[in-house]
From Swiss-Prot:
Protein name: Female-specific histamine-binding protein 2
Expression sites by tissue: Expressed in salivary glands.
GO cellular component, one term: extracellular region
Function field: Salivary tick protein that acts by scavenging histamine at the wound site, outcompeting histamine receptors for histamine, thereby overcoming host inflammatory responses. Binds histamine with a high-affinity (Kd=1.7 nM). Contains two binding histamine sites (H and L), that appear to bind histamine with differing affinities (high and low).
Length: 190
């Protein structure tokens, strides 16, 4: 009887551990489209725009952030890191603002390959987001809702007017039931 109770307790504990991570966090099934280092290096060659998000407030970009974009420089192959230059606006300042962050590819959810980004801001804040899906010109990023962040999803692409269908479909699949808003639009360039 004790063995049965211990077995049930172990099964329950393991299911709760799995329950703390999203369904897409499965390296065997989805790892080919969750390569954080490949995604970071792509930021050096292209500007990426956050075209959609399911949350409004960020500890760095502010409340009701809009017009978020990023480009990278200073690639460090040994650390698997870049210096990222973010541009954004928010409800406190309608002028374009900038933030420089060191972004490092790290592992989350027991993955063997780096599948997440650790951001280190100039003032010492540290945040970690996870790649839910990535392809050549787009990323769907999961913000776990820790470290002062709201939980949600972001859709990033190199062409804000032509969002690749595969990424838009993944974003919509993962963001189902959440309010989605546009972040970077052509209005950001006016």
């Amino acid at each position: 009887m004790k063995l049965l109770i211990l077995s049930l307790a172990l099964v329950l504990a393991l299911s709760q551990v799995k329950g703390n991570q999203p369904d897409w966090a499965d390296e065997a099934a989805n790892g080919a489209h969750q390569d954080a280092w490949k995604s970071l290096k792509a930021d050096v060659e292209n500007v990426y725009y956050m075209v959609k998000a399911t949350y409004k407030n960020d500890p760095v970009w502010g409340n009701d952030f809009t017009c978020v974009g990023v480009m990278a420089n200073d690639v460090n192959e040994d650390e698997k890191s870049i210096q990222a230059e973010f541009l954004f606006m928010n409800n406190a300042d309608t002028n374009m603002q900038f933030a420089t962050e060191k972004v490092t590819a790290v592992k989350m959810y027991g993955y063997n390959r780096e599948n997440a980004f650790r951001y280190e801001t100039e003032d010492g804040q540290v945040f970690t987001d996870v790649i839910a899906y990535s392809d050549d010109n787009c990323d769907v990023i999961y913000v776990p809702g820790t470290d002062g962040n709201e939980e949600g999803y972001e859709l990033w692409t190199t062409d804000y007017d032509n969002i690749p269908a595969n990424c838009l479909n993944k974003f919509n699949e993962y963001a189902v039931g959440r309010e989605t808003r546009d972040v970077f639009t052509s209005a950001c360039l006016e």
